[in-house]
Design a protein with these regions (language model features):
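Nucleotide-activated sugar donor-binding and catalytic core shared by glycosyltransferases
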Residues: 1-163
Length: 163
């Protein structure tokens, strides 16, 4: 199963639609998405199952059962996927497209783009090609755990003021 997660506060129509177009071409693949609030006119996928929100326990179960994660560039989702050693495909929200108030997600993907197991899609077309790649390849991920002291964790501690 492929798990799509866009966070709970904002919908992410560009990513939801890109995954939906990919699913239309790959009906044999099981995909489940957590898409945020779509009741205000947001994109509603027709080719995969989805919900607006999940409890933490439901999120964890879906993440655990997934082959890989397709997500916005939210730091919580990235770290959770890496902790579970799941490859993650990130598409950053962009302020110029009114997807967020600023471009911090672009900075996030720049920081993680060289991390083993992290893939970046800057356009909807990239989402499809990266999903094709992830479905056809065994991908190694960065080994990260809650006790890690590697460069990534040290960097995050520095940024968060904990190191």
């Amino acid at each position: 199963m492929i798990f799509v997660a866009v966070g709970t506060q904002l919908r992410f129509d560009r990513l939801a639609e890109a995954v939906d177009m990919w699913c239309k071409e790959h009906p044999e693949r099981e995909v489940f998405g957590q898409l945020g609030p779509v009741d205000d006119g947001g994109y509603r996928p027709r080719h995969y199952n989805w919900t607006d929100a999940l409890t933490k326990a439901e999120f964890d179960v879906n993440l655990e059962q997934s082959e890989f994660v397709v997500a916005h560039a939210g730091i919580g989702t990235i770290l959770t996927a890496l902790l579970k050693q799941k490859p993650v495909l990130l598409m950053p929200r962009r302020s110029e497209l009114a997807e967020h108030r600023n471009d911090h997600q672009l900075a996030t993907v720049r920081r993680f783009e060289d991390t083993k197991g992290v893939f970046v899609a800057n356009t909807p077309a990239d989402v499809g090609s990266q999903m094709d790649y992830l479905c056809s390849t065994v991908v190694a991920t960065t080994v990260l755990n809650e006790f890690s002291d590697g460069p990534l964790v040290k960097y995050l501690q520095k940024v968060l003021g904990e190191g």
